Amino acid sequence: MIEIIMLLCYNVFMISPRRDILIRRIDRMNITYIYHSSFLVETDSCYYLFDYFRKQLPKLNTEKPIFVFASHFHQDHYNKKVFELLKQQGMKNIHAILSKDISKRNYPETDGIEITRVTFHQHYELPCGTELQTLHSTDSGVAFLLTCPEGTIYHAGDLNDWMWKGEPEQENRQMTGSYRHEIQLLAGKTIDVAFLPLDPRQEEYYAEGMRYFLEKVDVKTVYPMHYWGEPEIIDRFLSEYPEYRHIVKQTETWQ
């Protein structure tokens, strides 16, 4: 795990005594990047953990509830081992929010975990004053839009404009249309923090999904994800689209 924490509060940078932790204050949420597409968001009342795949989790406050979100069944977005890790830490109140495409045989095997199965284009009321809206992924499962007392959080999962070199033009056009339809559902909302795919495997199409999102959605801060160990793709995006430097940040350094 790259243990980097962002405290959303006053738009100020702080460096902790540990050299590998950089803290950015913007509002009232602490955000830790875990790995790939996984992030931990801490508020005053609870934790939200998105798309855990692998790597170590930070030390958690066992008195707080934790909501574990899994956007779909792909192995780089869901690993039921996360529930064992949480139990090992002594977490007492664990609530899993799992996309319906995740097989029940891959549900947590430990007792005392509440499970909510979710599907696309639905609204759900969660504890801690949290509202959840789901979008339809262009790949598998859902994307998550959370509204909590501390702000609004968007985690795309695999909702992206998955255009690929060599694919039939018609399929790429259909993909773009499907993606844009979903993003337009966010029109009129203000999102405080968004976690969006920026995948170098798409080659010349790598920026299409993020660029459209930034054009259409009122978002304050974006952290790219799903870049398969190549954070240099963020530098490329910011070089090609410098107008978004004040929004799109370096995920592994928060710069």
Region roles according to the model:
Residues S178-L185, E203-Y212:
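A short, acidic, amphipathic alpha-helical segment used as a generic capping/interface helix at domain edges
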Residues I15-E63, E114-T190, E252-Q255:
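Core dinuclear metal-dependent hydrolase active-site scaffold
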Residues L49-F50, F69, I153-A156, F195, ...:
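Structural motif
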